Amino acid sequence: MGMFDFTDRVAVITGSTAGLGKGMAIALARQNCNIALIARRADKLEEAAAEIRTLGVKCLPVPCDVTSDESVANAADAIIREFGRVDILVNNAGTGGPACPVAELPMGTYKNLVELNMTSVFRMIKTFVPYMEKAGYGRIVNVASVLGMVGHLEVSLAGYASAKGGVISLTKGVAAELATKGITVNAIAPGTFPSESNGKEFMEMNMPFVLRTTPMQRTGTPTDMNTVGD
C-alpha cells in the first residue's frame, strides 16, 4: 500500500495518453484517485482510459486542445458535470525541440513552443483554480524541465528552455498567490524522457550527452513516474 489515499479525489492531467502524463495518471489511480485525461487524440484517450479503469477508479477521457480557450473551457465543463470537483491538476502537455541555433529558430516555431509549453499551463490554472478556491483545496503540479534551469551545452534548445523556464517562474508566482487558500502549486523538472513529442532524431542526437552527464547513464522512463504516489 502507498503512503497516500486519494479516494474520491479527482485529478485532471494534460498530455496524459503516453509517457510522463500516463505514468502520473497510473500512479494516482493506484492510490484510488479518479482521473480526467486530457489530450488531443480521442482514440488514444479511450485506450488510456480503458487501461486506467482496470485499476478500479473512474476515468473520463476528454479530447481537448490546451492551446484553445474554448476547448479548455468545454473540457472543464465536461469534467465538472462528471465529477463535480477538481482536486488535482497536472499540467504535463508540451512539446520539445527543435534543436537549432537561436538565430535560425523561426518566430512562428518559437511562439508555438511558448504557447504549448507555457501559456497552456497558465490557461489550465486560470480555468480550474476557481473550482479549487471554492472547495478550499487544490494541488497543482506543473511539468517543467531541467532545461528551464540550465542550458544544454551541446544542443541548442533555447526556445524550449525559455518556455519551461517560464513555467518555473509561473509556478512560483501562482504558488505565492494561492498559498493561503489551501492550494499548493509545485513544479517538477525532469531530465530527458523518450516521447513522441521529442522524436527519434532528437533522442538519437541527445543520447551521447545524456549518457555522459547522467549518473544513472540512462534516460527516464514512464515507469519512473508510476511510483510518484508511493
Model-identified regions with their sequence ranges:
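Alpha-helical segment proximal to the catalytic Tyr-Lys
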Residues: P130, A176-T180
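The beta1-alpha1 cofactor-binding region of Rossmann-like NAD(H)/NADP(H)-dependent oxidoreductases
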Residues: A42-D43, P63-A75, M107, D224
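Conserved glycine-rich cofactor-binding loop
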Residues: V10, T17-G19
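Active-site helix of classical SDR
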Residues: I125, A163, T171
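C-terminal helical subdomain
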Residues: T180, A187, P208-D230
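Catalytic Tyr-X3-Lys loop
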Residues: A103-R123, Y137, V141, V167, ...
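Conserved mid-core segment of classical short-chain dehydrogenase/reductases
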Residues: G96-K111, K134, E154-G159, G199-E204
